[in-house]
Swiss-Prot record:
This is U12-ctenitoxin-Co1a. Belongs to the neurotoxin 03 (Tx2) family. 05 subfamily. Expressed by the venom gland. Disulfide bonds join 2-16, 9-22, 15-31, 24-29. GO terms for molecular function: sodium channel regulator activity; toxin activity. It is found in: Secreted. The keyword Nucleotide-binding does not apply. It comes from the Eukaryota. The presence of a 'disulfide through disulfide knot' structurally defines this protein as a knottin. Keywords: Disulfide bond, Ion channel impairing toxin, Ionotropic glutamate receptor inhibitor, Knottin, Neurotoxin, Postsynaptic neurotoxin, Secreted, Toxin, Voltage-gated sodium channel impairing toxin. The lineage of its organism: Eukaryota, Metazoa, Ecdysozoa, Arthropoda, Chelicerata. Its main location: secreted.
Length: 40
């Protein structure tokens, strides 16, 4: 999940859902499609 690496962003990433990955840029949480999702 998003909080595995970017723990500080976990609360922000919760809105991303299971189909995206979270990247943390300072205080902003960016969401992107996960590699697993793109396989389908």
């Amino acid at each position: 999940g998003c909080g595995d690496i970017n723990a500080a962003c976990k609360s922000d990433c919760d809105c991303c859902g299971n189909s995206v990955t979270c990247d943390c840029y300072f205080t902003d949480c960016k969401c992107r499609e996960s590699a697993i999702r793109k396989q389908f």
